[in-house]
């Protein structure tokens, strides 16, 4: 009697593109052997809008409204890096009050970004309730943003040498009330999620990245700190006024999806600590450097001649970038957000290279999902925290 030979065929499955509110327009071509993942190929570029090329045909001030469309859930950070680079290039000082306002806005934006990571991540692994809870707190942050900047999401609030407007009357008290309320919210999330046996079953030991491996892949942010590397640009680069506050770098050593969750939850608590200290110690003074004057190199120009330039107290539309190159970076919620800027003695940058954290963190995905189960792909992808706006640019 002959035994029938069983044929073992691999199956190729397309995952995505998804709706931007979940994982964005990322397509994964997954090769499966039953439930086991054999290979995974990410397909990018569905949200490419040529952000770097647009930057090379705009002045810095014209380009500010565009940058909020990279990572549209943490827009304060994209604005911060866009003004930090020319500030460093031109050695422009930022008033202390403006620096405090920037830190408050950046940390509120970090919390909002982590909240909108937490909800869809929990929904992916089967917990629907936190998805609705996070919008409650996030809405309060957006109310604060709207009161200070006039916009809920695309704020356009940062300026070269400071911020666009001072904090309105009563805003500081409203923000302090939010901080007290939000600490109880974080405690509620931890009670609901952190010790939940079904949640732990889905994330513990899934998508492990070692410390050396994380460095070799160029990972940054919570992805790096969850692998035991205590690297936070707020401590390393000493930018803005973070050194004046008492806070700790949050890290875990396990390197799995649970560790990445714990790092982000702890970071929200640390952000609240920074915001509270900044609100209580915010100094007086100007909110913008009003002495950034751009004088024309040519002497004795007549006001209506072609090469006459308006001398303003604020950074004028003809703000020139000196002929040098610079790499500036900030610690965004997803990792190191950087810009390599080359000036050419003109109003437009000669080169404007964006280093998005999501794009570089996403590189390790095919390696993490190999030999895992199909259901683990969503857990691992969710724990990386990507926004396709900044991945595709």
From Swiss-Prot:
Segment forming the signal sequence: none
Annotated compartments: Plastid, Chloroplast thylakoid membrane
Coiled-coil positions: none
One GO term of the biological process aspect: photosynthesis, light reaction
Chief site of localization: plastid
Keywords: Chloroplast, Membrane, NAD, NADP, Plastid, Plastoquinone, Quinone, Thylakoid, Translocase, Transport
Reactions catalysed: a plastoquinone + NADH + (n+1) H(+)(in) = a plastoquinol + NAD(+) + n H(+)(out); a plastoquinone + NADPH + (n+1) H(+)(in) = a plastoquinol + NADP(+) + n H(+)(out)
Enzyme Commission numbers on file: 7.1.1.-
Gene Ontology cellular component annotations, sorted alphabetically: chloroplast thylakoid membrane
Record flagged with keyword Thylakoid: yes
Domain of life: Eukaryota
Topology versus the membrane: Peripheral membrane protein
GO molecular function: NAD binding; oxidoreductase activity, acting on NAD(P)H, quinone or similar compound as acceptor; quinone binding
PROSITE patterns given in the database record: COMPLEX1_49K (PS00535)
Function noted in UniProt: NDH shuttles electrons from NAD(P)H:plastoquinone, via FMN and iron-sulfur (Fe-S) centers, to quinones in the photosynthetic chain and possibly in a chloroplast respiratory chain. The immediate electron acceptor for the enzyme in this species is believed to be plastoquinone. Couples the redox reaction to proton translocation, and thus conserves the redox energy in a proton gradient.
Family: Belongs to the complex I 49 kDa subunit family.
Subunit structure and binding partners: NDH is composed of at least 16 different subunits, 5 of which are encoded in the nucleus.
HAMAP family: NDH1_NuoD
NCBIfam families in alphabetical order: PRK06075.1, PRK07415.1
Protein name: NAD(P)H-quinone oxidoreductase subunit H, chloroplastic
Taxonomic source organism: Guizotia abyssinica (Niger)
Gene that this polypeptide is encoded by: ndhH
């Amino acid at each position: 009697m002959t035994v029938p030979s069983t044929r073992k065929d691999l199956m190729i499955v397309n995952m995505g593109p998804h709706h931007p509110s979940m994982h964005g327009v990322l397509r994964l071509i997954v090769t499966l052997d039953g439930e086991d993942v054999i290979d995974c190929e990410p397909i990018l570029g569905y949200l490419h809008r040529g952000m770097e090329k647009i930057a090379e045909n705009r002045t810095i001030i014209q380009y500010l409204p565009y940058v909020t469309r990279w990572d549209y859930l943490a827009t304060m950070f994209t604005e911060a890096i866009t003004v930090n680079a020319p500030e460093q290039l031109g050695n422009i000082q930022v008033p202390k009050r403006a620096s405090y306002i920037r830190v408050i806005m950046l940390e509120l934006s970090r919390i909002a970004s982590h909240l909108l990571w937490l909800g869809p991540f929990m929904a992916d692994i089967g917990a629907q309730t936190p998805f609705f809870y996070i919008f409650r707190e996030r809405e309060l942050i957006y109310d604060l943003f709207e009161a200070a900047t006039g916009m809920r999401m695309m704020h356009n609030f940062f300026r070269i040498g400071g911020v666009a407007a001072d904090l309105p009357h009563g805003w500081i008290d409203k923000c302090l009330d939010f901080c007290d309320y939000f600490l109880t919210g974080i405690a509620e999330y931890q009670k609901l999620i952190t010790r939940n046996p079904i949640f732990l079953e889905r994330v513990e030991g899934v998508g492990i990245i070692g410390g050396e491996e994380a460095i070799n892949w160029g990972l940054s942010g919570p992805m790096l700190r969850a692998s035991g590397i205590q690297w936070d640009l707020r401590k390393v680069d000493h930018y803005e006024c973070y050194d004046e506050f008492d806070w700790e770098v949050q890290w875990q050593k396990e390197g799995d999806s649970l560790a990445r969750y714990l790092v982000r939850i702890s970071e929200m608590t640390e952000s609240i600590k920074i915001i509270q200290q900044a609100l209580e110690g915010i100094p007086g003074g100007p909110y913008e450097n009003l002495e950034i004057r751009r004088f024309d190199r040519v002497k004795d120009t007549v006001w209506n001649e072609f090469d006459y330039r308006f001398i303003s107290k604020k950074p004028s539309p003809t703000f020139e970038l000196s002929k040098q190159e610079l790499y500036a970076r900030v610690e965004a919620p997803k990792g190191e957000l950087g810009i390599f800027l080359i000036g050419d003695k003109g109003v437009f940058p000669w080169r404007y290279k964006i280093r998005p954290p999501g794009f570089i963190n996403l590189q390790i995905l095919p390696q993490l999902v190999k030999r895992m189960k199909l259901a683990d792909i969503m857990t691992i992808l969710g724990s990386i925290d990507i926004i396709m706006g900044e991945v595709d640019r």
